[in-house]
Design a protein with these regions (language model features):
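C-terminal outer-membrane/trafficking sorting elements
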Residues: 18, 506-516, 532-537, 564-624
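Short beta-strand segments within Ig-like beta-sandwich modules, predominantly Fibronectin type-III
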Residues: 517-523
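Pro/Thr/Ser/Gly-rich low-complexity, intrinsically disordered linker/stalk tracts
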Residues: 466-502, 547-566
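Beta-strand-rich modules
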Residues: 529-548
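Bacterial Sec-dependent N-terminal signal peptides
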Residues: 1-21
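Short glycine/proline-centered coil/turn motifs in the loop regions
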Residues: 60, 115, 393, 489, ...
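Extracellular, repeat-based ectodomains that mediate carbohydrate processing or recognition
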Residues: 20-466
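Short strand-edge motifs at loop-to-beta-strand transitions and within beta-strands
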Residues: 525-527
């Protein structure tokens, strides 16, 4: 049985998205003036429904530089048609890789390396003014002359990442909402390898995981590289081991990895390259959990297809199902010999690397056209996803979208832009919010940034937000400890938790070692389970009418419990620390009694939750 996500209630919505957005694929919606060479288009939607767009081009005489525009949920530009262009710094004549992130306080941050070799971050308020001045903030003590990345925090600040190709270092720091800098973190290698292509995903408690590549030159343009992950807190403390996700491979330096958060504090990682098993090119999937530990044992990764040397499987883009937390990955297939075929596939993976749709599902068949710019987004409440792609002759193209349900079956097909012309598409998606997603592109023939909205049913223009599903709250304070009765020589684990409100239909207790799933009545908030000495992992969910919750968390933030039941020869340690303050008493069935005084109890077996002499909260079984 798959674990399901606890759905967060969205605010009630009483309006319908309409106004400027059009329902005509032949016209679309004008968003900003751009030159014909504009590119590197990024898009991000704020919690309030406004969307920021960033593109790069030669403008204002200061080199290849970013420009930004803000639109509301109706598709109406909120700034001048030329957008906002930070022009304080002189930029190089090429792109080192710019970044953009919408912040939780409704602003936007852009980050870039200047021609002088410094990394700069600039924050722009919703009204177009500069929160930190147009000059922005110089990061990393002046280091970092190459590509940048940004990740929004939960308090209006951002994580920023910079790269020094010259030194082979990655630099990371957290910028507070007011522009205050936290300590710079340097990721480097003592043996002389380069640390490159850092990407960031959120870790619990507003921390960050950095997924990066360690590489050293092999020959010509080939490098031996592996993929690693390491976690940090805002004050620069390393919070997880530096873990290898992918074994070293010798591949072209241009093949780099991508990441997508799994919604549980970890992330999926994927990369396509020609050096592994299967086709001449294949896409490989990895995963790490909220502790930064790899959950896929094969360090070669799991391929989207098994053995198929006659075909390439590449150009992937992925999303995560918000309910099951599975990875949904879309990718292009073409024949190895002539590369004349073009199909779009999707496949599904869980966190252990199980390929749930076997060899994938074809969602766009070969039709003599080239399919490119593949993107994918899950519906905001699950139940399906949208695959976006362009279709054309490789230069002129149209924009299409296809709705797919959880079984991989097409449910709708929409042409978003029907006029065929050369275009540069956005590099990412903004995700569904209130039932709406947005695609954007630059018209390479005449210039101009254009966009189109689309709903969960493939509709454009007027979109009615969906009704949020009933929330699935998990239990909390999942605790437990070992128990041993020397008279009967019976050992057990005693578990307890705090019930969610409202109560579920029942709880599911997952016993990892025995692969059992035990159903527990909703009236109980503790459970006694006999086990032989050994180490046991338990997980707990709440089961509702329409969904199953996320796993319950322990007081220290883990979504599982490890109970060590010692051998019978050493069990005296279990009872040594006596309970001095009884908090709650349950009967053997897990029902809470109305007393915390043992003397008030009738004869029988009870479970006591209390505080010991050392201040530890424990759960123990007694016979009255």
């Amino acid at each position: 049985m798959k674990k399901l996500f606890s759905i967060i209630i969205a605010l009630a919505v009483t309006f319908t998205v309409k106004a400027q957005w059009v329902n005509n694929p032949a016209t679309n919606t004008f968003l900003a003036n751009t030159s014909t060479d504009a590119g590197e288009i990024y898009i991000a939607t704020c919690p309030n429904g406004d969307t920021y767009l960033q593109w790069s081009s030669f403008v204002g005489g200061n080199g290849w530089a970013p420009t930004l525009q803000r639109i509301n949920s109706l598709g109406e530009p909120q700034w001048d048609n030329d957008g906002v262009h930070p022009s304080y710094h002189q930029m190089a004549s090429w792109s080192q890789g710019f970044a953009m992130a919408a912040t939780s306080d409704g602003a936007v941050v852009t980050c870039f390396a200047t021609e002088a070799g410094h990394t700069v971050a600039t924050k722009i308020n919703p009204d177009g003014s500069y929160a930190w001045g147009e000059q922005g903030i110089t990061l990393f003590d002046g280091y970092g002359e190459s590509r940048t990345e940004l990740l929004a925090g939960d308090d209006g600040g951002v994580w920023a990442l910079g790269t020094s190709v010259d030194l082979g270092n990655i630099y990371v720091c957290y910028i507070e909402a007011n522009g205050t800098l936290n300590p710079t973190i340097t990721i480097s290698d003592d043996s002389g390898k380069l640390c490159m292509f850092g990407l960031m995903v959120p870790a619990p408690n507003n921390n960050v995981f950095v997924v990066y590549e360690k590489e050293q030159w092999a020959y010509t343009y080939f490098y031996e590289k592996d993929i690693r992950v390491v976690g940090y807190s805002k004050d620069g403390t390393q919070i997880s081991d530096d873990v290898q996700l992918m074994s070293p491979l010798t591949i072209s330096g241009s093949y780099t990895h991508y990441v997508v958060p799994d919604g549980l504090g970890g992330a999926y990682v994927y990369i396509w390259h020609p050096a592994g098993q299967g086709g001449s090119f294949n896409t490989y999937v990895f995963h790490f959990n909220q502790n930064g530990a790899s959950t896929i044992l094969d360090l070669n990764g799991i391929p989207v297809h098994l053995t198929d040397p006659a075909n390439f499987y590449l150009d992937a883009y992925a999303t995560v199902d918000p309910v099951s937390h599975d990875l949904i990955i879309a990718y292009r297939q073409t024949d190895e010999q002539f590369q004349s075929e073009s199909r779009v596939y999707v496949n599904r993976f869980n966190e252990t690397g199980e390929r749930l749709w076997n060899e994938g599902i074809v969602v766009v068949e070969e039709n003599g056209q080239t399919h490119s710019d593949i993107l994918i987004d899950a519906f905001e409440y699950g139940d399906g996803y949208t695959v976006f792609y362009t279709e054309g002759d490789g230069y002129y193209s149209t924009v299409k979208a296809m709705g797919i349900n959880d079984n991989g079956t097409q449910i709708w097909n929409t042409t978003m832009s029907s006029n065929s012309y050369p275009r540069t598409m956005c590099r990412n998606t903004c995700g569904y919010l209130e039932g709406q997603n947005i695609m954007a592109w630059v018209n390479v023939s005449s210039g101009g940034l254009y966009g189109q909205n689309i709903g969960l049913n493939g509709e454009m223009g007027e979109i009615t937000p969906p009704t949020p599903p009933t929330p699935c709250y998990p239990p909390t304070n999942f605790e437990g400890e070992a128990y041993y009765n020397p008279e009967t020589q019976i050992s057990a684990a005693i578990l307890s938790w705090t019930a969610p409100d409202p109560l579920p239909l029942h709880y599911n207790l997952y016993c990892e070692e025995t692969k059992e799933i035990i159903e527990i009545d909703a009236e109980y908030t503790s459970y006694y389970i006999e086990r032989e000495p050994g180490d046991y992992i338990f997980k707990l969910t709440a089961w509702y009418e329409d969904c199953e919750s996320d796993f319950a968390h322990s007081p220290n933030g883990e979504n599982y419990l490890i109970i060590e039941i010692p051998s019978h020869e050493s069990v005296a340690e279990i009872e040594y620390d006596e309970i001095v303050n009884i908090v709650e008493i349950y009967n053997i069935n897990g029902q809470l009694t109305n007393t915390s005084n043992i003397n008030d109890l009738n004869q029988g077996v009870y479970i006591i939750k209390g505080v010991t002499e050392s201040g530890k909260m424990v759960v123990r079984k007694i016979i009255r």
